[in-house]
Amino acid sequence: MAKKMLMMVYAAAMAVAVANPLPERVKGLATENIPWRSVGPGGGGWIQSILWSRHAKDRLFVGCDVGGFYVSENAGRHYEMRNRGLKHMYVETIAEHPSNPDILFLGTLGGIYKTTDRGQTWLEKRSGLPPISDSQHTIQISKFVFAPGNPDTLYAAVGQPRTRKGARGQIWRSDDCGETWRMVVKSGLDKNIDIYDLAVAADNPNRMLAATNKGLFRSDDAGETWAPSNDGLPSHLRTRHLAWSPSDPKVVYVTLMQVGGEKTWSAGVYRSEDGGRTWQPRSNGLKQLAGKPGSNDQLCTWTDCLAVDPRNPDVVWTGGASWWYTGVYGTTNGGQNWKRAFPDERPGWLKFWGPTVMCLSLSPADPSRLAFGTSGMVYTTEDGAVTWAQRYSEERTDGKIVGTGLDVTCLHSVTPSRHQRGKFYLGYYDIGLLVTDDDGRSLTRQMTGVPGKFSNSCFCVAEAPDDPQTVWAGFGSWGDGGSGCVAKSTDGGQTWLPCTNAASGWIDTHVRDLTVLGSKPNYHLLYASPKGLIESVDGGATWACVDLAEFPEAPRVRALAHDGGRLYAGVAGAKGEGGAVYGRDTAWRRLTPASLQIGQIKDVAVEGARILVTARNEYRDHTFRAGGAWFSTDAGATWRKVFSDKFCGAAVISGGELFVSLTDHPYHDHCVGGGVIHSRDDGATWTHLDGPGLQNWNASALAVDPFDRKSLWVGTGGNSVFVGRLP
């Protein structure tokens, strides 16, 4: 009996391990499961794929470029994130099993994933596919299609519709419902072909069409051999998406892309009435602007995604794909005439982006329902495009923003107020600064006064030590080479005034980090930048570069910290040296010896005499320098490496406990990060903080609530913020 019980416990433990596989980077650590809740505004990031379920009218699936996978059971009014088991969060395509509602497939930039429990857990399906790479994407999936009449057979096309940089000329086939795969193409598609879409005829599982960067290709032998099928299409052959009519297999539609600056407009929708052999233009009513010479593809007009009514081959929907041509367009006569079907007035809190359509789905269970995703929003109609609703956040009349589970945003920083319990400043990519004053239950976007050219991102926030209403923040565009500004608020962050006038000595550069000391009226500000450490001793009225005398070049300063009067700066390595930490009481001096060979510094945290510095792997000047975490207990007099990892990110010390985030870049097959690790013994041992409520391990920002040290805030690269409750 005891042996049987032991085996049951072991089996249960193994089931949990399989259901929630840990990243390789933390498999050697003990796991501490804690409760988590999500905080976010809803929307705000790229919606890359969307699909109405064929099995349940109210079920809607959404896939995003950094946020993974979401399910709504009430037609988009609320969502659940379901990312456990995914090792890549860019979901290009979603496929639902024709007869089993619990089986789904995700095509990501890093490969194929399958669930048998409707997304509660995912397993990677790699058998037969190329080996996993740590340096590149080996198989970027653009589309799945099931073979009609055989739900165990499905195809996976390889391509990258968004970047148009996924050319491999590959289509893979599985005959055991995705468990194993084989390359099916024998001829006709070369390695320079980027497959954007794939379709199969409803009445013939052997007949297929592929839309590619080099035109349409047709196969009549289940994908083994291919031939061009472009009769009637423009000569540029920039085909994009396909829609094969389920009710009339002779009817197929395809969209073509316009390239900015070409003299003649040659995009639009084309229709075939012979199964894709010949094509006729069907663009009457669609705007036809070629754009100015030298302009990019977003400054002309073209449509991209397609959906055809399963009952009527003449009822079709398409989505505007450029900045100048947004929203959804419909036809009821096979494309003879198109009309805009989406209103100019957009509901929801995201007003500063247009509804450029990135994905589109017509419900097979109820064709009066249409859903589309944009670079930040989801919209649906349930009455055939008569009325529309936003489906990414709650509709409020009090100016507050409350998400509904579809959080698709990335964080630069999480900054708790030192003065007001429950107030946090959240610095986002793309949407700027959002603030909560009720512990994350609602948010407000606080960007009034920030110049438009700096409004993309908020990188950092710092409150005055003695005044809760006085706040500074760093705004700007991505990247070290970007432009930026420091702005000041005297009303708790509601409005801002840039500290960047020409007479101030302001140095236009990216603002990586910011710290404030002193008291009214002469606050002491420092900000970290690629052009050095920039200082103001008069609250931002004037600025000057700080001389770090020991550093042989103009330092690229990456992080700042202070505890009391002492300042610390994490600095990128100069020629021949690794990263370094500097400290200042009365003068700056280097604290880390060159022998440490620290990689690219990401963060510095301090509490009393304890200093924690994190870094990622770096290869520079023909020398590899490792990432990890280094720790000092004596104000920088001595150091030891307490954790090794290729990409350590944010660092926090709270009540003597250490926290480090493990992140990653998104340019290889497995790139979900490693979550958060925690040490209670000065880095001698570490535990991995996990739990089913944490749906994103790509932790980019950390903070502990100063009013409640058991509350850990984790900003992520894709799913906004998670708040964990420490034991």
Predicted regions span which residues?
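Extracellular glycan-interacting surfaces
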Residues: 2, 18-727
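Sec-dependent signal peptide recognition
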Residues: 3-11
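Hydrophobic h-region of N-terminal signal peptides that target proteins for export
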Residues: 10-19
